């Protein structure tokens, strides 16, 4: 199975600083002393996934990890992976779409928040590639997030072995227009396919 791994290195930076999200405020957050959140959480997830695969040692179920080198991928992968090149200069939905189009993964594992989820779903377009979110942002209302990084690893492995089926889930995010008026309102921005698990998924 081809597992694409992407980390939004700016996700979650504003959490401890009281920001309502990190979109457009990453530099400000880092200047104020914010530390990486999404990357270390992805590493926790992949550490657990490696632990699971090593304990089972199944030859019939293997995982090939595809990732960019650098902070959006390779820096957080505790083992071998297939490099798809350096992290692009423009790390937006368009670069993510090109990543998906070029490598056609069977499952897309990402670390970030609701804003990251929206970018990925936009990048997927009409593709039915399933996604699993490692919780690493400030806002995580979407149903494609696992409850913890280690839960995300369990979901990935259970999907690889065929123990989980796919289901549609809602992609949610803060309505920025309403938020500018001082109101907190979360609304639906689309749908995504994700492995269904009441135990490990939100």
Predicted regions and their residues:
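ATP/NTP phosphate-donor binding region
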Residues: 1-106, 153-202
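Short glycine-rich anion-binding loops that position phosphate/pyrophosphate groups of nucleotides
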Residues: 9-10, 114-115, 137
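Residues at secondary-structure transition points
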Residues: 18, 118-119
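Glycine-rich beta-strand-to-loop/alpha-helix junction loops that act as flexible
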Residues: 68-69, 110-114
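Alpha-helix N-cap/helix-start and coil->helix boundary motif
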Residues: 73-74, 114-117
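Short, acidic/small-residue loops that bind anionic groups at enzyme active sites
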Residues: 107, 111, 120, 124-148
């Amino acid at each position: 199975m081809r597992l694409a791994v992407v980390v939004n290195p700016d996700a979650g930076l504003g959490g401890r600083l009281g920001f309502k999200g990190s979109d457009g405020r990453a530099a400000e957050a880092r200047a104020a002393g914010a530390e990486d959140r999404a990357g270390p959480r992805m590493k926790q997830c992949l550490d657990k996934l490696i632990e699971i695969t090593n304990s089972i040692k199944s030859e019939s179920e293997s995982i090939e990890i595809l990732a960019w080198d650098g902070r959006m991928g390779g820096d957080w992968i505790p083992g071998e992976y297939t490099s798809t090149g350096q992290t692009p200069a423009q790390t937006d939905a368009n670069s993510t779409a090109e990543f998906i189009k070029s490598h056609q993964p069977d499952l897309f594992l990402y670390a970030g928040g609701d804003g990251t989820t929206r970018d990925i779903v936009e990048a997927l377009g009409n593709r039915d590639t399933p996604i699993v979110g490692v919780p690493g942002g400030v806002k995580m209302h979407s149903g494609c997030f696992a409850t913890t990084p280690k839960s995300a690893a369990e979901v990935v492995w259970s999907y690889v072995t065929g123990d989980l089926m796919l289901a549609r889930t809602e992609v949610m995010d803060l309505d920025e227009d309403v938020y500018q008026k001082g109101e907190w309102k979360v609304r639906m921005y689309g749908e995504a396919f994700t492995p269904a698990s009441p135990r490990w998924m939100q």
